[in-house]
Amino acid sequence: MSAACISYFGGKKLKLTHSYAGKELKHWNQAAFISGIERLLGLYKPETTLKQMNMMTSHDTDRMLDTYGGDEKRLKLSVIFSFLFPGAINIYYGEELGLPGAFNAGTRQGMPWKNEKIWDKDLLGLYKRLAALRKGDEAIKHGKFEFLKEYCDGRALAFRRSSGGEALLCLMNNSSSEVNLALKQGALGNKPGAVLNSGVKLKPAGPKKLTAVLAPWAYAVYRL
């Protein structure tokens, strides 16, 4: 999962000083990313996937900030996808603070507990909100994952987690240009309300229709 996220969200900023499983990662377009994730989900039974550990980084990889070429906008999209993906997320210490570091030499330094000036408080806040959301939501912990391909246009990415009567829908814009998505009636529920939103606006587009306007690198999570 982490290799797929890096290949897709990294884009032209992708920067690695090592290989993953002996393979050099290259930029994936959206079609390749969706295909790769669906192939991964097809390898195991759903109940097995929910128990697997999703390691984003470790002491044997570059830190996320370096991997994404210092581009925090791309990093955040990858973090959100990883938190909402089935399985048990594993966060290497310091990633939530935006610590930099290349493989080996820069990934094993001590935690800067006493130097809060270098902490990225905005990124830390996002991690905290995602952790709280994940902890309290059955759809994320136990639900089905699916891409909403009618809203995946090469720039905008949409996916849903659902379990019983609970569901979450995530929209994100993995591009540097604004995206307008025409949403079907009821796509975001009867009373759309985002539990997480940065740069997504909903506009009426006729009787019971909405247009989601996604700013560059925007994201939003809606409880359905």
Predicted regions, residues:
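Aromatic/acidic polysaccharide-binding cleft in carbohydrate-active enzymes
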Residues: A4, F9-G11, L50, N54-E72, ...
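Short, solvent-exposed loop/turn segments at secondary-structure junctions
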Residues: S58-D62, L97-L99, G164-E166, N174-S177, ...
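Carbohydrate-binding surface patches
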Residues: L148-A187
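Solvent-exposed beta-hairpin/edge-strand motifs
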Residues: Q185-V200
